[in-house]
Amino acid sequence: MNLPLIDVVIPCYNTEQTLVRAVESVLQQNNLGHLWLIDDASTDNTFALALQLAAQYPNRISVEQMPKNCGVAMARNWGAMLSAKSAVDFVAFLDADDAYEPGALEVAAVTFHFQTDTSVVRLALKPINLAQRYAEHPNFDQAWQYMRMTCGGNIVFNKAFFFACGGFPTHQLFRELGGEDGALGIATTKTAKVATLFEDVGVLHFCREGMHAERLLDGLLFGKQDPAITAEKMAEAEQVTSTICRRIEALKCGLNSAEIGIRPLVVERTE
């Protein structure tokens, strides 16, 4: 069976302690196309380490460095743009402090191969070393469902659909508060087929105190709301999602037109 290949983008910022683990988990995937490491102007040895890894696997890994720290959304988007020059039709995003389980990309490739109308695949997201206050909460499974549907590190896109969405939103709002992956993730579920593979192999999500997911879990499980997330900013984020949806629907309208080809038109003007 000739399953499709999948390019992988890993955004990196001060991740020298975990990058090797993430990269090794990607390289063991049978359906890997090419791996792009995008250093977001790290201040530690991440970039040097990435170059070392690329030197070991020159045909499988490419490294780029952002000219300044631009945030994870921009780093992901830049990696996807670089991957666009390959013949591979799909791109996955993995965080530098997480890791794929063996066979993770294969289950995504199988899905795209047999379910050709799939635009997005969501891999299983498995928390490792999650604090007991979350893991033992009676509503944890429900809260984690939201996490794995909005996280940026367990998602695989049809590249054409990803670019049609405009990539991950890079608005200043998300630089301040995070959530760009959520804004895009919600838009995908409103405009396209999103296949979830939550009962299969996927992504090991290594947890730590202070991680971004804590804010989400604190809100969902304990009702703790970040005072920085105001109603106005929530409305702004929702508007970003709405804009992505509007653009996709407009694109569908054009692509589904029965009038394919050159159609000479004349504009009539009235006084």
Regions found by a protein language model. Name each.
Residues 186-203:
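Catalytic donor-sugar/metal-binding loop of nucleotide-sugar-dependent glycosyltransferases
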Residues 66-83:
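Glycine-rich, basic loop-to-helix element that forms the pyrophosphate-binding segment
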Residues 105-134:
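Conserved donor NDP-sugar-binding/catalytic core segment of glycosyltransferases
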Residues 25, 39-49, 68, 98:
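A conserved acidic beta->alpha catalytic loop
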Residues 174-184:
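Acidic donor-binding loop at a coil-to-helix junction in glycosyltransferase catalytic cores
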Residues 24-33:
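Short, acidic, metal-binding catalytic loop of nucleotide-sugar glycosyltransferases
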Residues 87-97:
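Short beta-strand-to-loop acidic/aromatic patch adjacent to the donor-nucleotide binding site
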Residues 45, 98-111:
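Acidic donor-binding/catalytic loop of UDP-sugar-dependent glycosyltransferases
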